[in-house]
């Protein structure tokens, strides 16, 4: 491990947030190494660029490992960084140039090359905010009358991951509700009005559920363990009974044990999307939606 921070210098003609996020994502893959991100934003003139490159040079001459990541619209500015880094023997990553060149080639047009041009609010920004608020307001089936407004409806035992998954699906732009299923208690009658293809059951390994519930009970000072809430034998029975309810509902069941939130979300979206097609309809796609395949 390096004795001093390894420096990633971000040079940008705007905020530099795009490059910073990429640098942070890459940095997360190196545990135990101290990577320091140095930002040089709003670089619009040659003197400003010279000042930024001097800071890079000083760090390099001090014996630190340094690399430069930049998002610059103007070709001359990109060339200035590239030439300086080559002269200093420093690794340099141009995030903007190759993208602009590819788009110019594909469109047959020249880029406007206007620094600091506002990119505007994402087309799906307000959709995502609204969907996340919807998930929070309708957590644990709080407002049964609104179940039919959801794009996706999650059903399962308490602490099977329904709430965080609902909010994450909301972040992706899908209005999601979650309904707790409890043995001996009938699901809300409003659930019958929800399209079958929208409903997904969640389950989880009994031992894992015991660990999660045990932490919650300890956090409450031992309260909340009534009716075997954190008892393994009772949990096995609960999962079995809730599984029967889920099968009566005719919904697919996804085991969330060991799955990252993103993986669970992808599985839910895939299964709902496929069931919607089978039903002769389709799951609403949020504007600008995207998701990573596991």
Swiss-Prot record:
Keywords: Kinase, Nucleotide-binding, Serine/threonine-protein kinase, Transferase
Class of enzymatic activity (EC top level): transferase
Gene Ontology terms for molecular function: ADP binding; ATP binding; phosphotransferase activity, phosphate group as acceptor; protein serine/threonine kinase activity
Short name of one Pfam family: Kinase-PPPase
Source organism superkingdom: Bacteria
EC number: 2.7.11.32, 2.7.4.27
Keyword Lipid metabolism: no
InterPro entries: Kinase-pyrophosphorylase, PPDK_reg
Binding site for ADP: 156-163
Known catalytic reactions: N(tele)-phospho-L-histidyl/L-threonyl-[pyruvate, phosphate dikinase] + ADP = N(tele)-phospho-L-histidyl/O-phospho-L-threonyl-[pyruvate, phosphate dikinase] + AMP + H(+); N(tele)-phospho-L-histidyl/O-phospho-L-threonyl-[pyruvate, phosphate dikinase] + phosphate + H(+) = N(tele)-phospho-L-histidyl/L-threonyl-[pyruvate, phosphate dikinase] + diphosphate
Family indicated by similarity: Belongs to the pyruvate, phosphate/water dikinase regulatory protein family. PDRP subfamily.
Alphabetized NCBIfam families for the sequence: PRK05339.1
Function (record text): Bifunctional serine/threonine kinase and phosphorylase involved in the regulation of the pyruvate, phosphate dikinase (PPDK) by catalyzing its phosphorylation/dephosphorylation.
Protein name: Putative pyruvate, phosphate dikinase regulatory protein
């Amino acid at each position: 491990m390096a004795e001093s921070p390894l420096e990633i210098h971000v040079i940008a003609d705007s905020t530099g947030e795009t490059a910073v996020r990429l640098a942070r994502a890459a940095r997360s893959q190196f545990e135990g190494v101290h990577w320091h991100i140095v930002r040089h934003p709003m670089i619009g003139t040659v003197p400003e660029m010279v000042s930024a490159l001097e800071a890079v040079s000083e760090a390099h001459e001090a014996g630190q490992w340094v690399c430069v990541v930049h998002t610059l619209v103007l070709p001359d500015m990109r060339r200035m960084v590239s030439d300086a880094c080559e002269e200093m023997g420093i690794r340099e990553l141009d995030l903007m140039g190759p993208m602009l060149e590819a788009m110019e080639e594909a469109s047959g047009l020249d880029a406007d090359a206007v620094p600091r041009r506002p990119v505007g609010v994402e087309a799906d920004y307000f959709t995502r905010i609204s969907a996340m608020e919807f998930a929070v307001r309708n957590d644990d089936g709080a407002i049964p009358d609104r179940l039919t407004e959801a794009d996706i409806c999650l059903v399962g035992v308490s602490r099977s991951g329904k709430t965080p998954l609902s909010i994450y699906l909301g972040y992706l732009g899908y209005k999601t509700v979650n309904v707790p299923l409890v043995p001996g208690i009938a699901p809300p009658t409003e659930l019958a009005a929800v399209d079958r293809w929208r409903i997904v059951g969640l389950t989880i390994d009994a031992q894992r559920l015991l660990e999660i519930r045990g932490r919650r009970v300890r956090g409450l000072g031992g309260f909340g363990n009534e009716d075997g809430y954190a008892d393994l034998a009772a949990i096995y029975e609960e999962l079995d009974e809730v599984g029967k309810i889920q099968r009566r509902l005719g919904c697919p069941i996804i085991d969330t044990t060991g799955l990252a939130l993103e993986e669970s979300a992808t599985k839910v979206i895939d299964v709902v999307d496929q069931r919607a097609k089978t039903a002769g309809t389709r799951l609403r796609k949020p504007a600008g939606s995207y998701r990573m395949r596991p």
